[in-house]
Structure formats: C-alpha cells, structure tokens
C-alpha cells in the first residue's frame, strides 16, 4: 500500500511539474525575428524620411536595443515607446536610455506586438521580416490614425506600395502614410 501511495504521489508531482512547465511555455513566445541592430546611418535615414519632430510619438515595433527610439528622443526631442518580446532586449534598451539620459522621453515594453495597442503613435518604425510586416499591416491600418507615418528598414508591405523609398548605406528604407478611413 505504501508503494502505491508513493507511486501516486510521484505521478501527481510529475503531472504538476509538467503543467507548470507547459503553462510557462504557453504564456511566453520566442521572437519571430532575430535581433539585428540597425546601423546608425540607417536609423538617421529612417527618422529623416519620417520627418520626426518634437511633437511626434514614435513606436518602434521590435525595438531591440532601443537605438531608434533613443535617437528620436536625443536628436528630435520626440517621445517614444519601444516594443519587443525579448526581455533581454528590453533590459538592454532601458539601460541604453538611462545612459543616454532620455528616460523622461522614452520607455520600453516587453510585449507581443500583435497584441499591443500602439494607436497613440504618429510614427511607427519597423525592422521585421516580410511575413511579419504583412501580418502586421491590417493591425497598423486598424489602430493608427490617418496621417501616421510608417518607416520600414529593408522590407516592404507586399502590395501596399510605399510613397517613398530611399537607399541609405546599401539598405532600402520604405515610407508609407496611413490613409484616410473609408
């Protein structure tokens, strides 16, 4: 009888531990895109193409180390939010903002960009993969106000033709404006 109780206890313990592991795995996602830093010249090109000003609220989706949001705050006085699913990137971005002394203008959130409200943005920057851009497009169209500027490093949005493209440091940068709602 003692052996059965011990076996049952071990079985329940195993089930409980596995359920904790599953719950943790189910509630966290790995990044859809590997972290590849945007070169400084491309960051500058993206912000110039978007015509960022001190009145802008910039959201960088897949912000990595925060360099785009931080540069927008330093150079143009914009406020901004960086969104990234990777907690290591958020820690790094927050540290970089502290070192740049722009924590009064920027913040970083660990979140799934497909489940995040970025409707306050006047500028959105992206360095994601083509499939992610395509998946994100209807969310951008739904959430963002007409006139919001979108700038993407290296990848377009399929059949949504950019208003402008520029080459910076061997990289194409794409620019769109959210159209009036129909």
Positions of predicted regions on the chain:
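Bacterial N-terminal signal peptides
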Residues: 7-20
């Amino acid at each position: 009888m003692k052996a059965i109780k011990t076996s049952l206890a071990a079985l329940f313990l195993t089930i409980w531990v596995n359920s904790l592991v599953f719950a943790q795995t189910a509630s966290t996602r790995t990044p859809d895109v590997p972290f590849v830093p945007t070169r400084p010249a491309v960051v500058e090109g993206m912000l110039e193409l978007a015509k960022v000003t001190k009145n802008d609220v910039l959201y960088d989706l897949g912000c990595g180390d925060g360099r785009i949001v931080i540069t927008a705050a330093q150079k143009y006085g914009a406020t901004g939010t960086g969104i990234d699913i990777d907690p290591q990137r958020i820690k790094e971005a927050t540290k970089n903002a502290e070192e740049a002394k722009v924590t009064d203008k920027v913040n970083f959130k660990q979140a799934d960009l497909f489940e995040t409200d970025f409707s306050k943005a006047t500028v959105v920057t992206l360095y994601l993969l083509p499939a992610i851009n395509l998946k994100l497009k209807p969310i951008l169209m739904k959430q963002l106000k007409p006139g919001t500027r979108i700038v993407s490093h290296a990848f377009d949005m399929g059949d949504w033709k950019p208003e402008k493209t520029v080459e910076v440091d061997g990289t194409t940068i794409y620019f769109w404006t959210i159209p009036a709602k129909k």
